[in-house]
Amino acid sequence: MSTMLIAVILLTLLALFFGVLLGFAALKFKVEGNPIVDELEAILPQTQCGQCGYPGCRPYAEAIANGDKVNKCPPGGTATMEKLANLMGVEPEPLNAEAQSQVKKVAYIREDECIGCTKCIQACPVDAIIGAGKLMHTVLTADCTGCDLCVEPCPVDCIDMIPVGQNLKNWNWRLNAIPVTLIQETPHEEKRG
């Protein structure tokens, strides 16, 4: 046999041995996760924004499982908070007062200063920044959660967080709709006389 064939066979056997060893170690030393944390994390919006005071959705889910409040997720809103409260069996509370009092902000890239490094795109957890390498980037304001994670990695500091004012484009018309009460028609009684 040639030395090349011996080397290939030897490497294949070595890879097979270590593969079996790793498979055994994975089964023997398997760490069971907390299933309630997995369920809580599935409910959270996965923006990894840190507005709750934790570095991501998984740590916040672990904190909720350990008894922290369920009302600290501004991107998730009231619907997420109610689902979390239902799962944990606690009373729903209004969203965190700090989160509600803050004006919603979105990222704004000063495109004339942008060098197209793509670091902000990589940092954005919701893909709200579009652009390509060596070209200017821009933010899709409808998708931006205002998490502020894109500001720090920018090497030329061309990203600002600006407050979003209400205008015709972002006004929630259904929220401020005029209440309408439907009246059921009743058969009229015939006039006598």
From Swiss-Prot:
It holds the Pfam family Fer4_21. The keyword Transmembrane does not apply. Residues 105-134, 136-164 form the 4Fe-4S ferredoxin-type domain. It is found in: Cell inner membrane. Keywords: 4Fe-4S, Cell inner membrane, Cell membrane, Electron transport, Iron, Iron-sulfur, Membrane, Metal-binding, Repeat, Translocase, Transport. PROSITE patterns: 4FE4S, 4FE4S_FER_1, 4FE4S_FER_2. [4Fe-4S] cluster 2 binds at residues 114, 117, 120, 154. Residues 32-90 form the 4Fe-4S domain. Its EC number is 7.-.-.-. [4Fe-4S] cluster 1 binds at residues 49, 52, 57, 73. [4Fe-4S] cluster 3 binds at residues 124, 144, 147, 150. One of its GO terms (cellular component) is plasma membrane. Its cofactor is [4Fe-4S] cluster. Binds 3 [4Fe-4S] clusters. GO terms for molecular function: 4 iron, 4 sulfur cluster binding; electron transfer activity; metal ion binding. GO terms for biological process: electron transport chain. The complex is composed of six subunits: RnfA, RnfB, RnfC, RnfD, RnfE and RnfG. Belongs to the 4Fe4S bacterial-type ferredoxin family. RnfB subfamily. Part of a membrane-bound complex that couples electron transfer with translocation of ions across the membrane. This is Ion-translocating oxidoreductase complex subunit B. It comes from Shewanella sp. (strain ANA-3).
